[in-house]
């Protein structure tokens, strides 16, 4: 079976425009650079066909008002392609309708420069890219991940042997998200908690910026990857919400969440980046991934799996997985919400875990075993026992139980519960524009000297 994208070396005419030389074989056609870029952009526009995103006149203006779309930008290939397509769409609307646009675009990046050891900062690279879409103005905001940490709501969380979660509030202390994640038992747990942070912060920024829609750059391959990863992590109940267009409510505001690149494979995304000459804007981690499976996260493993499928000509497997995942729905009965990730809990995970696991030790049968047991009991600190007795139970889902299950020692795991700290912006190009205007009105020493 052929790969999803094949770069052509022989001279052949594009099957679309019939004038330029074809450079890639995509799906069933051989296309030139311009036709391929137009083909990918058409896939996104198909997803954004709603009237609210078009240039509005008459009653439509009153019905939809000014639409604002938040684009979640990681700096990777998919989100970069999404930004380029939206930028070109706005530029086209601006030219065809004499300065009018169907919506305003707010780009938000969660700063992972230090966390993932990135090769560059968003605020240094992307202003140059945004300048390509003039006269369209696109807002670029870089948010600190520490915005998630509310020091007033920090709790120490422990899992009991019978899988119940206990928490106790701790004194407010200055701590960063990176420091909290260091307490995770493994990389997969840290990755899982980071996803919770990302989703929460993006929705909070969308509400604050008065955005009615949030768009993610997840392509079809990434969505299929997400389905497998969520299943492995015990978060199958949120698969539908994580991959399908849906509506979220935050601060009494309804926000539509969309995945416009859902019909495009990762190989096709990479081809777009190459042909549109966007490579210099791609932000990536400088940390080399381990070649040993046990040192990889769950998402790393599933990503490698789909890369192998693509390389061997089975890229369409991602389409099958993604379409199957779209058909999944959440159970109708809801007991409560998880106090860590906010997901609906449909059945008590501790009851189910107790039925399928054995946590009690074997019976003591010899005097030697009894002696060792008494020594163990004597080594337990009374302070620790009193501390555990003073903890309060909290509701957590099965996925969070798995994530926190490997926390070692009596220190527990520190996490903010039901808190909402102030959003901390590290960069806003709106502020940069305002500063430029102010600088134009600042008099220098020479300008201040007036001859009489």
Curated annotation (Swiss-Prot):
Keywords linked to the UniProt accession: Cytoplasm, tRNA processing
PANTHER family, sorted: CYTOPLASMIC TRNA 2-THIOLATION PROTEIN 2 (PTHR20882:SF14)
Pfam families named among the record's database cross-references: CTU2
A GO biological process held by the record: tRNA wobble position uridine thiolation
Record pathway: tRNA modification; 5-methoxycarbonylmethyl-2-thiouridine-tRNA biosynthesis
GO molecular function per UniProt: nucleotidyltransferase activity; sulfurtransferase activity; tRNA binding
Top-level taxon: Eukaryota
GO cellular component: cytosol
Protein name: Cytoplasmic tRNA 2-thiolation protein 2
Similarity comment: family membership: Belongs to the CTU2/NCS2 family.
Role summary: Plays a central role in 2-thiolation of mcm(5)S(2)U at tRNA wobble positions of tRNA(Lys), tRNA(Glu) and tRNA(Gln). May act by forming a heterodimer with NCS6 that ligates sulfur from thiocarboxylated URM1 onto the uridine of tRNAs at wobble position. Prior mcm(5) tRNA modification by the elongator complex is required for 2-thiolation. May also be involved in protein urmylation.
Major place of residence: cytoplasm
tRNA processing found in the keyword field: yes
Location in the cell: Cytoplasm
């Amino acid at each position: 079976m052929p790969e999803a994208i094949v770069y052509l070396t022989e001279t052949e005419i594009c099957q679309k425009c019939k004038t330029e030389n074809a450079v890639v074989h995509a799906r069933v056609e051989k296309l030139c650079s311009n036709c391929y870029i137009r083909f990918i952009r058409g896939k996104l526009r198909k997803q954004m066909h709603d009237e609210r995103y078009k240039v509005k006149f008459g009653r439509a203006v009153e019905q939809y008002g000014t639409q604002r779309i938040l684009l979640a930008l990681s700096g990777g290939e998919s989100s970069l392609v999404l930004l380029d397509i939206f930028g070109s769409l706005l530029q086209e609307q601006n030219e065809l309708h004499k300065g009018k646009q169907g919506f305003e675009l707010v780009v938000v990046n969660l700063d992972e420069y230090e966390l993932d050891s990135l090769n560059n900062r968003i605020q240094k690279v992307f202003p140059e890219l945004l300048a390509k879409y003039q006269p369209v103005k696109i807002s670029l905001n870089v948010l600190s991940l520490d915005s998630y940490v509310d020091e007033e709501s920090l709790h120490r969380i422990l899992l009991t042997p019978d899988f119940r979660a206990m928490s106790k509030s701790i004194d407010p202390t200055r701590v960063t998200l990176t420091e909290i994640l260091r307490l995770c038992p493994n990389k997969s747990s840290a990755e899982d908690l980071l996803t919770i942070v990302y989703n929460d912060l993006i929705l909070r920024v969308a509400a604050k910026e008065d955005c009615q829609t949030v768009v993610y750059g997840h392509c079809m391959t990434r969505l299929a990857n997400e389905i497998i990863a969520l299943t492995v992590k015990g978060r199958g109940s949120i698969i539908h919400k994580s991959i399908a267009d849906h509506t979220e409510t935050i601060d009494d505001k309804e926000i539509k969440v969309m995945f416009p690149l859902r019909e495009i494979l990762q190989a096709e995304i990479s081809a777009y980046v190459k042909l549109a000459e966007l490579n210099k804007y791609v932000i990536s981690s400088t940390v080399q991934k381990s070649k040993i499976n046990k040192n990889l996260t769950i998402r790393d493993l599933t990503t490698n799996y789909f890369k192998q499928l693509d390389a061997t000509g089975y890229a369409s497997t991602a389409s099958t997985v993604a379409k199957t995942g779209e058909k999944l729905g959440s159970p109708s009965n809801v007991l409560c919400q998880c106090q860590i990730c906010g997901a609906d809990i449909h059945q008590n995970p501790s009851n189910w875990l107790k039925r399928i696991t054995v946590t009690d030790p074997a019976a003591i049968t010899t005097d030697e075993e009894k002696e060792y047991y008494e020594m163990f009991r004597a080594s337990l600190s009374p302070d620790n026992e009193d501390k555990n007795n003073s903890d309060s139970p909290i509701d957590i889902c099965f996925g969070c139980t798995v994530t926190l299950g490997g926390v070692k020692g009596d220190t527990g795991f520190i996490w903010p519960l039901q808190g909402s700290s102030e959003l901390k912006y590290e960069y806003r190009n709106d502020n940069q524009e305002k500063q430029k205007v102010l600088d134009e009105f600042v008099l220098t020493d020479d300008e201040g000297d007036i001859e009489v």
